[in-house]
């Protein structure tokens, strides 16, 4: 995989695991893994549907973080190397 986004999960408390930032981090890891999977299995349409659901959930969480804590949103976007939300 091109991006390895791993974190030592034992050092993270249960409260931090429920945070929006951590949820976005976990969803981004799943997106990276599925993207790698699709390079080998391009016609796996059921997994593509799952990927779209994950992307939708991540987008909603990013929108929430954008509204509530913009500084944290910007830091997370840079740290994960993903695009931010579209600006209208």
UniProtKB/Swiss-Prot annotation:
GO biological process: translation
Chief location: plastid
GO molecular function: structural constituent of ribosome
CDD domains: S15_NS1_EPRS_RNA-bind (cd00677)
SMART domains cross-referenced by the UniProt entry: Ribosomal_S15
Pfam families associated with the record: Ribosomal_S15
Protein name: Small ribosomal subunit protein uS15c
Organism for this UniProt entry: Marchantia polymorpha
């Amino acid at each position: 995989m091109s991006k390895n986004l791993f974190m030592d999960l034992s050092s993270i408390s249960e409260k931090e695991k429920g945070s929006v930032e951590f949820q976005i981090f976990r969803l981004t890891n799943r997106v990276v893994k599925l993207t790698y999977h699709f390079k080998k299995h391009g016609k796996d349409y059921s997994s593509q549907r799952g990927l779209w659901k994950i992307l939708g959930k991540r987008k909603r969480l990013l929108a929430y973080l954008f509204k509530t804590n913009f500084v944290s949103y910007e830091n997370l976007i840079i740290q994960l190397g993903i695009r931010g939300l579209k600006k209208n």
